[in-house]
C-alpha cells in the first residue's frame, strides 16, 4: 500500500503539468510546466515502481534511469528555453530581467 503513494504523487504531478502546458500563455511558462511534469512525475512513478518490483537488478536499472532523468531533463529544458529566447520568442511578462543582463 505504501508503494502506491509515490505512484499517485507522480500521476498527479503529470496531470497538473499537462494541465499547465495547455493553460499557460507562452512557451516559457509551458516549458516550466512540462519540465516539472517530466522531472517530478517520472521520478514519482519510477520510485513507486522500484518499491513494487522484487528484483534488485530491475531496481538498480530504475535508479540509474532516475538519476539520468534528473541530470538530463533540466539541461534539455534550458537549451529549449535559450533557443526560443535567441530565436526571438518574447515572453509574455511585463519585465524581461534576462534582457537587462544580456544586451
From Swiss-Prot:
A GO molecular-function annotation: sodium:proton antiporter activity
Highest taxon in the source lineage: Archaea
InterPro entries in the record: PhaG_MnhG_YufB (IPR005133)
NCBIfam families, alphabetized: CPA3_mnhG_phaG, PRK12675.1
Entry-linked PANTHER family: ANTIPORTER SUBUNIT MNHG2-RELATED
Family named by the database record: Belongs to the UPF0091 family.
Name of the protein described by the UniProt record: UPF0091 protein PH0944
Native source species: Pyrococcus horikoshii (strain ATCC 700860 / DSM 12428 / JCM 9974 / NBRC 100139 / OT-3)
Amino acid at each position: 500500500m505504501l508503494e502506491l503513494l509515490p505512484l499517485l504523487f507522480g500521476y498527479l504531478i503529470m496531470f497538473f503539468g499537462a494541465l499547465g502546458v495547455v493553460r499557460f500563455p507562452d512557451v516559457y511558462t509551458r516549458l516550466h510546466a512540462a519540465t516539472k511534469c517530466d522531472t517530478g512525475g517520472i521520478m514519482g512513478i519510477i520510485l513507486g515502481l522500484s518499491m513494487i518490483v522484487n528484483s534488485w537488478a530491475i531496481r538498480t536499472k530504475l535508479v540509474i534511469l532516475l538519476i539520468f532523468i534528473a541530470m538530463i531533463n533540466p539541461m534539455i529544458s534550458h537549451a529549449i528555453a535559450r533557443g526560443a529566447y535567441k530565436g526571438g520568442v518574447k515572453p509574455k511578462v511585463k519585465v524581461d530581467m534576462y534582457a537587462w543582463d544580456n544586451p
